[in-house]
Regions:
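Short linear motifs at protein or domain termini
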Residues: 1-103, 214-224
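A short secondary-structure junction motif
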Residues: 24, 28, 151, 160-167, ...
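C-terminal regulatory/effector modules of DNA-binding transcriptional regulators
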Residues: 44, 173-224
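Conserved amphipathic alpha-helical segments that form helical-bundle/coiled-coil interaction surfaces
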Residues: 86, 90, 107-169, 180-189, ...
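Short helix-capping/hinge motifs at transmembrane helix termini and TM-loop junctions
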Residues: 102-106, 149, 172-173, 218
C-alpha cells in the first residue's frame, strides 16, 4: 500500500487536497475520463469526504474534472480544441501580463523573484525530469503574472497555468521543452523595462509551442 501524498500543512485542507488530486491528474495517475471515487480518495488522503468535496469545485473551475448527476465526478477528457483554446487564451492574457510586468519593472518593481524562478528553470532543464521541468517552467510564467501586479489577471491566469502544466507534462520531450532561451530573452526585456519587446518575445514563445504541442497530441486526443 502506498503512503498518503505529502501535503503542505500551511494550506487549508481543501486546497491541500486540490493540489494532491491535481498532481495525480497531471501525472496521469488519475487518467482522463476516470471516475473520482470519494471513498478511495478519502482513504488515500486520510481525510473525511467533507474537505474532499470542498476541493472539487476548484478542480472543476480549473478544468481538471467534470461532474454530472449520471456520470458522477470524472477527470476531464481533453480534446485538441481544448488545447488550442488554451494557447489562444495564453496569446491574449499571458502576452499582456508580460507587457505589464515590463512596464512595472520600468517603474522600479523588483524582478528578483522572476530572476530566481528563471534560474531554477534553467537548472531544471538539464535534469530531463518532466515533473521538475514542468513545475519550474510554469513557475516562471507565474512570476511574470505576479510581477504584472493585476490581481484579476492573476486569478484568470490561475486556471490557465494549471492546465498548461498538465499539457506540458503530457507532451514533454527534451526537444519540445527546449533550453529556456526564450524565457531568458523575455526576462531581459522585462528587466530592461521594454514592454513592447517583452510582449513580442512572449508572443513568439507561445506561438512556437502551439504547433508542436498540437501535432504531438493529434494522435491521442479527439478533435472536439
Amino acid at each position: 500500500m502506498s503512503a498518503a501524498p505529502e501535503l503542505p500543512s500551511e494550506e487549508s485542507l481543501a486546497h491541500q487536497i486540490y493540489r494532491g488530486i491535481r498532481g495525480k491528474i497531471i501525472s496521469g495517475a488519475l487518467p482522463q475520463g476516470s471516475r473520482l471515487r470519494e471513498r478511495e480518495l478519502a482513504e488515500e488522503f486520510r481525510v473525511s469526504r467533507v474537505p474532499l468535496r470542498e476541493a472539487f469545485p476548484q478542480l472543476e473551475a480549473d478544468g481538471f474534472i467534470q461532474s454530472s448527476p449520471r456520470r458522477g465526478v470524472r477527470v476531464t477528457s481533453l480534446t485538441l480544441k481544448d488545447v488550442d483554446d488554451l494557447f489562444e487564451a495564453r496569446l491574449g492574457l499571458e502576452v499582456y501580463a508580460t507587457r505589464l510586468a515590463a512596464a512595472r519593472a520600468a517603474a522600479g518593481a523588483s524582478v528578483d523573484a522572476l530572476d530566481a524562478a528563471l534560474r531554477a528553470a534553467e537548472d531544471a532543464y538539464p535534469t530531463k525530469d518532466p515533473d521538475l521541468i514542468a513545475e519550474a517552467n510554469v513557475a516562471v510564467h507565474d512570476e511574470i503574472v505576479w510581477l504584472a501586479g493585476n490581481s484579476l489577471l492573476s486569478t484568470m491566469m490561475h486556471a490557465i497555468s494549471g492546465r498548461y502544466r498538465w499539457i506540458f507534462r503530457m507532451t514533454y520531450t527534451p526537444e519540445v521543452a527546449g533550453s529556456g532561451d526564450e524565457h531568458r530573452d523575455i526576462f531581459e526585456a522585462i528587466r530592461n523595462g521594454d514592454p513592447d519587446l517583452a510582449a513580442a518575445i512572449a508572443l513568439v514563445h507561445v506561438v512556437h509551442g502551439r504547433k508542436p504541442t498540437l501535432a504531438m497530441l493529434a494522435g491521442t486526443l479527439p478533435r472536439e
